[in-house]
Amino acid sequence: MRKIFCALAAAALMAGCGGEASKTESALQLMKAEDFQATIDGKKVDLYTLTNGTITMQVTNFGGRVVSLWTPDREGNMEDIVLGYDKLDRYVNNTGERFLGAPVGRVANRINEGKFELDGVKYQVPQNSNGHALHGGNKGIDMVVWDVDYVADNAITLVLHSKDGEDGFPGNLDIKMTYTLTDENEFEVTYHATTDKKTIVNLSHHSFFNLLGEGNGSITDHVLTIKSSNITPTDAGLIPTGELQPVDGTPFDFREPHAIGERIGADDVQLKNGGGYDMNWVLDREDNGQVMTIASVYEPTTGRCMDVATDQVAMQFYSGNFFNGKYAGKYGKAIKYRESLALETQKHPDAINHDGFPSIVLNPDEVYTHVCIYKFYTK
């Protein structure tokens, strides 16, 4: 097992970028490994730097979080395009937004009142968000230390054993998660999970992106496309009603590109419920489990683009509506209202409580799998 420090990442960038190396290297304000080194619950925590020669990512095994992600704009200038914190204690003490850069689960998104039933057994998980369960409860999979299984220059594999009854969920759940920076400038996330008891699983990834760079302005001019003809509408508590709502003629129709801010202020009950965009899009796809591109984002000032591909059936789009500038990110800039977006591939929220939604039940003889790919390029 080999850990790659900042100096090695810079060297790799020099090798990969030729004449642009000095500009690229000097532009990267990488986080310091020593600011992320600790022992928590008897496990070592550290910071790992990955690179494919063009993009560079830093990951901590506390919560399996992406701390920074550097990509070039159309002129080759590098920016860190994800929100994060500069020190481990910001994550451990939950100072600010809890889910920055994290995998979320066991069940991503919301469970109505934190209640569900399996084979006649009723379960209650923590109501950690306005009377409902959000992203796995009080600890989830983001407030624990993952074990490092494998590290390479461009990839890291983390594993987690979530015990039976943890946060109220049944079954011993074993999760393997791999982050890879591919030669095609993709950030690929893969999950595999198994259980020894019938349970529910719906994992997702929760990086907050700003293609201008962290703290560099609003995402309302980012241009978004989503391959989806329906959303799952919610009540005022952001719990799905169980229906599908066609996007035709609504602010939720992103089948053709639209600036995020173009219709975000429309007089629509769903936008009011979420304070902006914060809902689940049902993806237009064949039910064959293949990985396909389902969304794209374009930032016109820098030319940065991000495609999202997945094998999942749905995606949550959140437009950073609840940030208020109270807390600063990695570089001292306030994390402000609508200065980031999340695109979270998943199955439908609260699926366990809606018979018509795709199943999130995992049995002992099954393997849960999930692929999400964020691809970066410019135009």
Question: Residue ranges of each PLM-predicted region?
Answer:
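Positively charged n-region of N-terminal signal peptides that target proteins for export
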Residues: M1-I4
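Sec-dependent N-terminal signal peptides
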Residues: C6-A10
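C-terminal motif of bacterial Sec signal peptides marking the signal peptidase cleavage site
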Residues: M14-G16
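An exposed, glycine/acidic-rich loop-and-rim segment of catalytic or binding clefts
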Residues: G18-K379
